Structure formats: C-alpha cells, structure tokens
C-alpha cells in the first residue's frame, strides 16, 4: 500500500512513527505540509511527550530519511495541485483537520488518490469506522472517503459495544477529561468560536463541547440518540479519560460489568481494549497503544442498572495506532 500524509502535525507524525515502529507493509511516499521539511524532520525526531524517535531520522534533498526509507516533502496548499496520480497513491491520510467534509476530502480523489482516510470526525455523509467496533463493515468498492472518528470515540465506542452486546443500553452521558491539544492557547487569548477555549490551557480546567458520544451512533446505529456528552480540557500534555454514566437495559452488578469487559479485552477486543485493577493515574498511560483501558477500581454502581464507568486512553498514540490498524485492514480487504 502506498500512502501519503496530508498534514504533519501531532497525529500525522505519530502515525508515521507507528508505521515505522511496527515495520508495517505500508510505503509512505510523501508528506504534504506547509512547514519546511527540515523543521518537520526536527519535530518528528524530537517529541516532548513521547521522547526521541528510536532510529536515526535526517533531512536530505527535500526528503525525510529514516533508514532505507526516503519520504518526499511537499508544501502545496491547493489540494487539487498535488501529484497523487503520479505518485500512485492508494490512501491519503488526511490529518490537517481542515478537509473533514466529503466535498473537500474528494479533492484528493480529483488529484489521483484512490482513497481518503480522515483522521478526525467527518462532516456529512462519510462512513465512520472504529477498529474493534464496526471495521468489518468496510466496503472497499463503495467506501472511498472514510473517517476514523476521534480519539475519544475510539475509547468510548468499544466500551459501549461491550455494554450493548451484554446488557443493552437505554441512555448515557459521557464526560471526557481531555488533555490539552495544539489548538488551545498557552496563555489567555481571543477565541471567537469558543470564548472559554481561548483561556490558558495550563492554567485552567476548561469546559468544552464534543461530538464524540453522539458519534458512537455512527458506528453503532443501535445507540443513535442514546448517548451525548461534553469535555473538560485539563492541564496535562497527554492522556485523557472517559467517564461514562450509563443506564443499562437489563439488571446486573458492577462485578458482572467488569467481567464482561475483562472477557472482551482478552477475546473480541484484544489489542483494542485493556482491563486493569491497578491503582493507575493518567501518566501511566503515556504511550499506551490501546484505544480504551477500563479502570475497574474507578467505576461505581448506583443500583443494578445505573453505572459510572471509567476508561483511559492516550489520545495521541492510541489513536495513531488505530489509524495504522485501519490502513492495514483496508490493505488486506481491498484486493
């Protein structure tokens, strides 16, 4: 599979790290970003959260060079001028955060790419796939522009599926206590869209909106209209946690819920979910590749149908790992 990464920010860089780490059978032929290639190489090589890249990475002749791999840097703002046809691109990993609706993403197809994977919640009629939840429904003939949802949906949806399959869900409210991201301000500044979002990221707990819970309905249609939620942005650089307050359809115990999650984590959700009874905190999950880590000690039951459940996730590495998983799944099911 030949891919390009459009947008080499936090997610784009970590997707490449994960591809190289696992030596995935994916050839990254180009990176398109308006930042200079030498600076992008520096940002790829050194990461304040995840540490320095394990192998040597250098910038040479307009390329990022890692071992035997040479990845060409492009800096083209107009997507329709990108040479995807000449490069024989199978999939564009669209990680700018800008081309999230179908019409904009389709410009990559006009440039010659065969498929587009949006690494964010998509707008409009774009199929959403979450590994471990509904990825088997991917149709290579028709699903040309797809979304991998958000990091939070990738944490919540596997947990919701386990609950749905075992007990049924009547309704639920989710809060994600979410690490700061690059769109936030270090100190107070104007934010026209969200006034509170412009306040200093490392001085405040900031309430914010999120469509992550509603988006679960895109990959689990049975839950459409049954889940919603909000976010608190908090002063940590990485790792977030989902707090799901949920009313189940059938009576059960907290112990039975834990057992169902534990079983799924070792079978149908293996490598997607993890189960822990350890006394963990957020920094314990920096670099964690699971989508969702169920914290059995942190949850609580009000009665036999009403529960508060807690799941951790590295909102950067965990999500980037699922993107690579989805790319490999597409590769294996597009022949």
Curated annotation (Swiss-Prot):
One annotated Gene Ontology cellular component of this protein: cytoplasm
Annotated catalysed reactions: D-glyceraldehyde 3-phosphate + phosphate + NAD(+) = (2R)-3-phospho-glyceroyl phosphate + NADH + H(+)
Membrane-spanning segments: none
Main location: cytoplasm
Cell compartment(s), UniProt: Cytoplasm
Pathway the protein acts in: Carbohydrate degradation; glycolysis; pyruvate from D-glyceraldehyde 3-phosphate: step 1/5
Binding positions (NAD(+)): 10-11, 33, 77, 119, 315
Binding locations of D-glyceraldehyde 3-phosphate: 150-152, 181, 210-211, 233
GO MF annotation list: glyceraldehyde-3-phosphate dehydrogenase (NAD+) (phosphorylating) activity; NAD binding; NADP binding
Annotated EC: 1.2.1.12
InterPro entries, per the entry: GlycerAld/Erythrose_P_DH, GlycerAld_3-P_DH_AS, GlycerAld_3-P_DH_cat, GlycerAld_3-P_DH_NAD(P)-bd, Glyceraldehyde-3-P_DH_1, NAD(P)-bd_dom_sf
Keyword NAD annotated: yes
Alphabetical UniProt keywords: Cytoplasm, Glycolysis, NAD, Nucleotide-binding, Oxidoreductase
Pfam assignment, any one: Gp_dh_N
Residues annotated as the enzyme's active site: 151
Record-marked site positions (Activates thiol group during catalysis): 178
GO biological processes: glucose metabolic process; glycolytic process
Function summary: Catalyzes the oxidative phosphorylation of glyceraldehyde 3-phosphate (G3P) to 1,3-bisphosphoglycerate (BPG) using the cofactor NAD. The first reaction step involves the formation of a hemiacetal intermediate between G3P and a cysteine residue, and this hemiacetal intermediate is then oxidized to a thioester, with concomitant reduction of NAD to NADH. The reduced NADH is then exchanged with the second NAD, and the thioester is attacked by a nucleophilic inorganic phosphate to produce BPG.
Quaternary structure annotation from Swiss-Prot or TrEMBL: Homotetramer.
Family: Belongs to the glyceraldehyde-3-phosphate dehydrogenase family.
Name assigned to this protein: Glyceraldehyde-3-phosphate dehydrogenase
Taxonomic lineage: Bacteria, Pseudomonadati, Chlamydiota, Chlamydiia, Chlamydiales
Gene name, Swiss-Prot/TrEMBL: gap
């Amino acid at each position: 599979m030949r891919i390009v990464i459009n947008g080499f920010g936090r997610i784009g860089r970590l997707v490449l790290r994960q591809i190289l780490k696992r030596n995935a059978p994916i050839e990254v032929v180009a990176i398109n970003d308006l930042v200079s290639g030498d600076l992008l190489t520096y940002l790829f090589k050194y990461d304040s959260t995840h540490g320095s890249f394990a192998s040597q990475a250098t910038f040479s002749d307009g390329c990022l060079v890692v071992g035997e791999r040479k990845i060409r840097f492009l800096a083209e703002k107009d997507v329709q001028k990108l040479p995807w046809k000449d490069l024989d691109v199978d999939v564009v990993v669209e990680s700018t955060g800008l081309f999230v609706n179908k019409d904009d993403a389709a410009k990559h197809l006009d440039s010659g790419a065969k498929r587009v994977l949006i690494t964010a919640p998509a707008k409009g009629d774009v199929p959403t796939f979450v590994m471990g939840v509904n990825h088997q429904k991917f149709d290579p003939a028709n699903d040309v522009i797809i979304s991998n949802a958000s990091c939070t949906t990738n944490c919540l949806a596997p947990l919701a599926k386990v609950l749905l399959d075992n007990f049924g869900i009547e309704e639920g409210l989710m809060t994600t206590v979410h690490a700061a991201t690059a769109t936030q301000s270090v100190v107070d500044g104007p934010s026209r869209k969200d006034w509170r979002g412009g306040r200093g990221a490392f001085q405040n707990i900031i309430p914010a909106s999120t469509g992550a819970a509603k988006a679960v309905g895109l990959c689990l249609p049975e839950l459409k209209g049954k889940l919603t939620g909000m976010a608190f942005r908090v002063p940590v650089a990485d790792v977030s946690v989902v707090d799901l307050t949920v009313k189940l359809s059938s009576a059960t115990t907290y112990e039975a819920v834990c057992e169902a999650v534990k079983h799924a984590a070792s079978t149908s959700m293996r490598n997607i979910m993890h189960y822990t009874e350890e006394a963990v905190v957020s920094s314990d999950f920096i670099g964690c590749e699971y989508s969702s880590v169920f914290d059995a000690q942190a949850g609580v039951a009000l009665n036999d149908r009403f529960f508060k459940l807690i799941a951790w996730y590295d909102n950067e590495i965990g999500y980037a790992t699922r993107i690579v998983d989805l790319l490999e799944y597409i590769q294996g099911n597009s022949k």
